[in-house]
């Protein structure tokens, strides 16, 4: 499992989980299962599967880059992020569901492409006005991005044509040139990105609202950086206004707010453990 969501806040809600499924021998895809919310037993049933699959190749750096983050939209719609599984041709192909942000109808299972040109989006949060998605996305070596996705129009975020990172082996690839501009090639520039020189700070993995500050303030967790960033967003201009690091000393895979206790759960994968983050307002 890579991510989860609830269909609603009602006690009778269903829980949804995204995962990677091997649909054919050595061929994988994104899928979603769901179950009635039950604290004794969860009986998951298949809800959604991307029909195409990508053949896994064994290589020195076997990156899966699968996306798999879920977020509930108002009404009967769900957001699913997908990665490219290192199939560079997929993110720019409108006939493929890989390297995309998808909107899925919870009643019919029919999907719709929201944005294209993504590598591995694994942080996802819906803005307060419900018009934008805030996305954190793993780059290659460097080039991690914070992107703002407008839900009202399909836009292209450039991967693998444009990226501010480099390939892990330092080489070049015709199918993935990683040009150091998005706008020059007709793509949306990231609201924020981390260059190779900042590589020790990146690995952005999850997003949660910063409820202590309110407004458009968020907490963005990292893996390699062992940092949580406090970030202020201007959605109308697709900009990061302020960003400041907070050292936590662990790879934070996920961060979730507990409204009843007014603190955050940190899922720290290298310990492994669950941490608690509280805000000191003194």
For each of these PLM feature ranges, what is it?
Residues 50-62, 147-155, 174, 251-258:
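Hydrophobic transmembrane alpha-helix bundles
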Residues 238-259:
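Conserved blade-ending motifs and adjacent loop-strand segments that build the rim/top face
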Residues 4, 11, 84-241:
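Beta-propeller domain segments
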Residues 48-52, 58-62, 112-117, 194-196, ...:
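Surface loop/turn motifs at the tips and blade-to-blade linkers of beta-strand repeat domains
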Residues 1-87, 123-139, 197-236, 259-281:
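Acidic, Gly/Ser/Thr-rich repeat motifs that build Ca2+-stabilized beta-propeller blades
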Residues 34, 69, 100-103, 119, ...:
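Basic side chains
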């Amino acid at each position: 499992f890579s991510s989860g969501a609830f269909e609603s806040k009602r006690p009778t809600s269903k829980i949804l989980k995204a995962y990677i499924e091997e649909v054919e021998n050595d061929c994988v895809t994104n899928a979603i299962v769901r179950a009635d919310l039950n604290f004794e037993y969860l009986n998951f049933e298949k809800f959604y599967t991307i029909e195409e699959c990508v053949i896994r190749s064994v290589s020195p750096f076997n990156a899966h880059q699968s996306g798999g983050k879920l977020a509930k939209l108002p009404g009967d719609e769900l957001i699913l992020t997908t990665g490219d599984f290192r199939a560079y041709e997929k993110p720019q192909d409108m006939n493929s569901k890989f390297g995309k942000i998808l909107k899925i109808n919870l009643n019919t299972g029919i999907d719709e492409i929201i944005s294209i040109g993504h590598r591995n989006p694994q942080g996802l949060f819906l803005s307060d006005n419900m018009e934008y998605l805030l996305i954190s996305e793993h780059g290659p070596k460097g080039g991690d991005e914070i992107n703002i996705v407008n839900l009202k129009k399909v836009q292209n975020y450039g991967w693998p044509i444009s990226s501010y990172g480099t390939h892990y082996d330092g080489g070049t690839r015709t199918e993935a040139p990683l040009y150091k501009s998005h706008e020059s090639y007709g793509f949306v520039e990231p609201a924020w990105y981390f260059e190779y020189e900042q590589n020790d700070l990146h690995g952005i993995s999850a997003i949660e609202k910063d409820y202590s500050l309110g407004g458009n303030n968020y907490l963005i967790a990292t893996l390699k950086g062992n940092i949580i960033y406090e970030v202020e967003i201007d959605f109308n201009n697709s900009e990061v206004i302020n960003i400041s690091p907070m050292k936590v000393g662990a790879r934070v895979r996920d961060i979730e707010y507990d409204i009843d206790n007014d603190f955050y759960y940190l899922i720290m994968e290298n310990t492994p453990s669950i941490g608690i983050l509280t805000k000191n307002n003194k």
